[in-house]
Amino acid sequence: MNKENIKNLEAEFNQLPAKSVGKMDIKNLKEMANKSPRKRYRICLHNSTNHPTQEMIICLKYFNYLRPHRHPSRVSESYHLIEGALDVYLFDQKGEVKDIFKLAAPDFINQENRSLLYRLSNSIFHLVIPRTEWTIYHEVATGPFNKDISVEYANFAPPEDCDPKEAVEYCKKITNNNIHLL
C-alpha cells in the first residue's frame, strides 16, 4: 500500500461550519485507528490543508513511531491531552535530547508529574511517544499545511516507514530503554 493510500485511511476532514467532538467521536476514532495499518487516525476539524489553523483530534493505539521533525519558525503547535499520556522529546541539531515534556489527560494528571498542555513556538526537532494503550490528543498548528514546506524530518532518526524494529530500537535508545506503556 502506498503512502497516499495509508494517509487516506488515517484522516478525515470536517466539512461542517461548526463541529463538536464527543464520546461517540472518540469511540469512532478508536475504531478507525484499530483498522488503519499504522494504528492511528485523526479528525481534522479544519476543512483542508489550506486553512490557516490546522486543528486535529489525533488517536494513537499502543506504541506508534512518529519520526522526529520540526516546523518552520512561523509555525507553532500545541497538544492538549484528551485520553491517555504521551511524552514529547525535544532535540538539538545533532539528535541529542534537550528536554522532555510529559503530558497526560486529567485521569492521569497526578502520575509522574504530567501536564495537560504543551506548546512549541520555535523550530525545534521533536518526537511524540505515546505512553498508554490509547493516546488521544487535540493538536493545533499554524497553517496552511504543505508537507514539503511545513515539515522537516530529522536526518538523525530512522524514516517513518522503516522496519518497526529499527523504530523501536531508536526510541529505546533515546528514552533509556523506556518505551513501555504506563
Where in this protein do the model-derived segments appear?
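Glycine- and acidic-residue-biased ligand/ion/polar-headgroup-sensing regions
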Residues: 74-94
